Amino acid sequence: MIRDITIGQYYPVKSRIHSLDPRVKIVCTLLFLVSLFIQSSFLGYVIATLFLGTVIHMSKVPLKYIVKGLKPIVILLMFTVVMNLFLTRGGEVLLHFWIFTITEEGVRTSVFMALRLMHLVAGSSLMTFTTSPNGLMDGMEKLLSPLNKLHLPVHEVAMIMSIALRFIPILLEETDKIMKAQIARGADFESGNIIQRAKAMIPILVPLFVSAFRRANDLAMAMEARCYHGGEGRTRMKPLKYKGRDKAAYLITIIYVAGVFVLGKFVPFRVWIF
């Protein structure tokens, strides 16, 4: 389960999506995530799936990596579906048993929430799969650069966010190593109730925190050794510059979001339900 979390991992390969400006990927990902919350139709999610599937194909990231990232949220998905299925009221009653009632609106809401969560995770994972940590930091810093006029530490904020994302797979790998070492010593993380499992995690947390602080200290020393003193006066070997493909990506994403919005607002329910 730990190794299935893919957010923060980078998949190096040459593709059209990898070659896009990091700012384009960040903004387009945010627009895609926003579009998921204005979806109000099954057809809208079909279009979202086709859009995301096309981008995944163009990125050359294996589909198994995207699917792998969905495994950690299976329990959350099941919980969300069950809660919405039995607690949402409205529409025709499809099934009634004891105190449980399943309605048409409950089925619709549970399916929508499950699809939304899967698309959220897949879209976010794809951005980190196709954007290097340095590119991600440069893109965020450039997007937030107008805040420099307010004397906000934009470079430092972008650096912190980039390091935090980069540390996710590192800490997950470290957790996996510690768990395997504890299991080899006879530790049991699977049996027992919730409290017993929580207590069993204590031998993992202590060495994990020690390792995290050690890695953070090593990173700080490496940055100091390279005379890093923040973003002031710092130059880049490859300055970010928009190209034709970046503008095309913006245009395609805006058309997609606009189409989803129009579909949800102006197309009658019975037209798009199937």
Where is each model-derived feature located?
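Juxtamembrane/interface alpha-helical elements of multi-pass membrane proteins
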Residues: I73-A187
